[in-house]
Swiss-Prot record:
GO terms for molecular function: ATP binding; ATP-dependent protein folding chaperone; isomerase activity; unfolded protein binding. Belongs to the chaperonin (HSP60) family. Keywords: ATP-binding, Chaperone, Cytoplasm, Isomerase, Nucleotide-binding. The keyword NAD does not apply. This is Chaperonin GroEL. It comes from the Bacteria. It comes from Dehalococcoides mccartyi (strain ATCC BAA-2100 / JCM 16839 / KCTC 5957 / BAV1). SUPFAM superfamilies: GroEL apical domain-like, GroEL equatorial domain-like, GroEL-intermediate domain like.
Length: 537
C-alpha cells in the first residue's frame, strides 16, 4: 500500500492536534468534581464513565497523523494503568502539558534532544523526591481513604478495606457483576497463579483484555501440546461433557494452538488455554494443588498418561475462571473440602521438614493459595450502564489501594507533585537542558489546575494558593476548602503519582524528538450504485 509522509513542523502540528483532542476529552474527568464521558457502544446503551484509560482506549481519530499523537498519549495512560491501576487521567494531563510546552520551545529554536535530556534529569530528581516524601500506609482507616478517593464513594472505600482486612494485603480479590442492586462480598475456595492466557485470541472482554469462563471444565496436564493428533481425541471426549473448557498445560503451541483458536473464533468451542505455573517439580506440585482444588486429576507424563486417556473423572470444575496476560484466578473450585484440608496438612509438614529458605518460601506460597481462598466482590446496580461504571470504580479503588500498600502515600489532589517541585532547584543545568527542567516545572501544576477547573474554580488562582501553602496542604475540591490533605483524608498512592509522571515524560520525550510520520494512504471506498443500477450485471 502506498504511504503518505510528513516532516518537521507538519509533524508537530499533527501530533499536537491528536494529543489535544484525546487529552481535552479525558481531562474533564479529573478530580472529585470531574465530569463523566459517554462512550457509544455498537450494541445497547452508551457507557457513562470517568475512567481515563477506558475513555482513551475508545478514541480513534480519522486523520492518520493526528491519530498517532492520540495513540502515543493513550500509551502513557495504559502503562500507568498496568503499573499502578490508577492515575491514568493524571498521566494524560501531564503528557499533554509536557508536549505542548516542549513544542513551543522547539518552535522558538530549542534543540529537541537537549530538551529531552533536561526532562529526563528533572523526572529522575522528582521520582527520588517523591519516594522521600512518601509515608507508609498506617491502619485500616488510611486504606478506606485511598479507596474512597479513587472509587469516589465512601461505601467503596469501606468495602475494599473490609475485604483486605479479611484476606490480607496479598490476598486474591476478584470483582464480578451482580444481578442485585448493591455491593455484596463472599469468600470462596480458589487460587491465583502467575500465568496468563497463551493467546490473546482467547480474550472474551476486549475492554479489560481478559478471558472470563463461567462454569468451567478444566483439563490439567504437565505435557506440552503441539499436534492436533494428540489433542483431538481428548477434545471430542470433553465436548460431550462441556463446551466451556480451560486447558492448563506446560504449553500449547504450533498446530494445536491454531486449532483451538480457529474453533474459538468459529464458536464451536468456548475455550481458554493457560500455561501451567512454575517449573519442573514445583509445576507438578502446583498442578496437583489445582487438581485437588477443582476435583480433577493431572494427566501426567510421569504416570505414563496421554491426553487421549482423559475421562470425565479427570476433569476439574470451577464456577468461574478469569485470565489476563499475566495471571489466572480460579474461583469456587468444586474439589472436596476434606481433600483440600489434607493437602494443606501435607504442605505444612513439608514446610517444617525443609531446610532450604527458597523451598520454604515457595511452599508457603502454595499453602497461602489453598488456605486464603478468594474474596469476591459482586457489584450490582439498577441498570447495566450504572453497574459497569460502578464496577470500573471498584476495580480502580482496589488497584490504588494495593499500590498504596506497596509504595506508601502522598498528599492527594496533585499536591504531592507540587511539594516535590523544590528539588528541581538543585539541578544546575544550562541552555536547552535547563529549559527542559522548566518544562517539567510548568507541567506539574496542571493536575491541580484541572482538578480546580473541573470543580468550577479558577485553576490558576487555586494553583498559586497551593504553592504558597505549607508542605502537605492543598485544595480539597470536594468541599472547596484548603488545608492539610492527609488530615482531610485526601491521599494518593506514591506508585500512582510516580508512574503517572514517569510514563507521561517517557511518551512526551518520544513525541518531541519525532521528526517524520509515515502512514498508509487510505483508499476511498467506491460509491454505492444508484437505484437505476439495481439488478444490472
Amino acid at each position: 500500500m502506498a504511504k503518505q509522509i510528513i516532516f518537521g513542523e507538519k509533524v508537530r502540528v499533527s501530533l499536537k492536534k491528536g494529543v489535544d483532542t484525546l487529552a481535552n476529552t479525558v481531562r474533564v474527568t479529573l478530580g472529585p468534581k470531574g465530569h463523566p464521558v459517554a462512550l457509544e457502544r455498537k450494541w445497547g446503551a452508551p457507557t457513562v464513565i470517568d475512567d481515563g484509560v477506558t475513555i482513551a482506549r475508545d478514541i480513534e481519530l480519522p486523520d492518520a497523523f493526528e491519530n498517532m499523537g492520540a495513540q502515543l498519549v493513550k500509551e502513557a495512560a495504559t502503562r500507568t494503568s498496568d503499573a499502578a491501576g490508577d492515575g491514568t487521567t493524571t498521566s494524560i494531563v501531564l503528557a499533554q502539558a509536557l508536549i505542548n510546552e516542549a513544542f513551543k520551545n522547539i518552535a522558538a529554536g530549542a534543540e529537541p534532544i537537549n530538551l529531552k535530556r533536561g526532562i529526563e534529569k528533572a523526572v529522575a530528581a522528582l521520582k527520588a523526591q517523591l519516594r522521600k516524601n512518601s509515608t507508609p500506609v498506617k491502619g485500616k482507616q488510611q486504606i478506606v481513604q485511598v479507596a474512597t478517593i479513587t472509587g469516589k464513594d465512601p461505601e467503596i472505600g469501606n468495602l475494599i478495606a473490609d475485604v483486605m482486612d479479611k484476606v490480607g494485603k496479598d490476598g486474591v480479590i476478584t470483582i464480578e457483576e451482580s444481578r442485585g442492586l448493591r455491593y455484596e462480598t463472599s469468600y470462596v475456595e480458589g487460587m491465583q497463579f502467575d500465568r496468563g492466557y497463551i493467546s490473546a485470541y482467547f480474550v472474551t472482554d476486549p475492554g479489560r483484555m481478559e478471558s472470563v469462563m463461567e462454569d468451567a471444565t478444566i483439563l490439567m496436564t504437565d505435557r506440552k501440546i503441539e499436534t492436533v493428533a494428540e489433542l483431538l481425541p481428548a477434545l471430542e471426549k470433553i465436548l460431550q461433557i462441556s463446551k466451556n473448557l480451560v486447558i492448563v498445560a506446560e504449553n500449547v503451541e504450533a498446530e494445536a494452538l491454531a486449532t483451538l483458536v480457529v474453533n474459538k473464533l468459529r464458536g464451536n468451542l468456548n475455550i481458554l488455554a493457560v500455561k501451567a505455573p512454575g517449573y519442573g517439580d514445583r509445576q507438578k506440585a502446583m498442578l496437583e494443588d489445582m487438581a485437588i482444588l477443582t476435583g480433577g486429576h493431572v494427566i501426567s507424563k510421569e504416570a505414563g498418561r496421554k491426553l487421549d486417556s482423559v475421562t470425565e473423572a479427570d476433569l476439574g470444575h470451577a464456577r468461574r475462571i478469569v485470565s489476563n496476560k499475566d495471571k489466572t484466578t480460579i474461583i469456587d473450585g468444586e474439589g472436596s473440602a476434606e481433600a483440600i484440608k489434607d493437602r494443606i496438612k501435607q504442605i505444612k509438614a513439608q514446610i517444617e521438614e525443609t531446610e532450604s529458605a527458597f523451598d520454604r518460601e515457595k511452599l508457603q506460597e502454595r499453602q497461602a493459595a489453598l488456605v486464603g481462598g478468594v474474596a469476591v466482590i459482586a457489584v450490582g446496580a439498577a441498570t447495566e450502564t450504572e453497574m459497569k461504571e460502578r464496577k470500573a470504580r471498584v476495580e480502580d479503588a482496589l488497584a490504588a489501594t494495593r499500590a498504596a500498600i506497596e509504595e506508601g502515600i502522598l498528599p492527594g489532589g496533585g499536591t504531592g507533585l507540587l511539594n516535590a517541585l523544590p528539588c528541581l532547584d538543585a539541578l544546575k543545568l544550562e541552555g536547552d537542558e535547563a529549559t527542559g527542567v522548566n518544562i517539567v516545572r510548568k507541567a506539574l501544576i496542571e493536575p491541580v489546575r484541572w482538578i480546580a477547573t473541573n470543580a468550577g474554580k479558577d485553576g490558576n488562582v487555586i494553583v498559586d494558593k497551593v504553592k504558597n501553602s505549607p508542605v502537605g496542604h492543598g485544595y480539597n475540591a470536594e468541599n472547596d476548602v484548603f488545608g492539610d490533605m492527609a488530615e482531610m483524608g485526601i491521599i494518593d498512592p506514591t506508585m500512582v503519582v510516580r508512574s503517572a509522571l514517569e510514563n507521561a515524560a517517557s511518551i512526551a520525550n518520544m513525541v518531541l524528538i519525532t521528526d517524520s510520520l509515515v502512514a498508509d494512504i487510505q483508499e476511498k471506498a467506491p460509491a454505492a450504485p444508484g437505484p437505476e443500477a439495481a439488478g444490472m450485471y
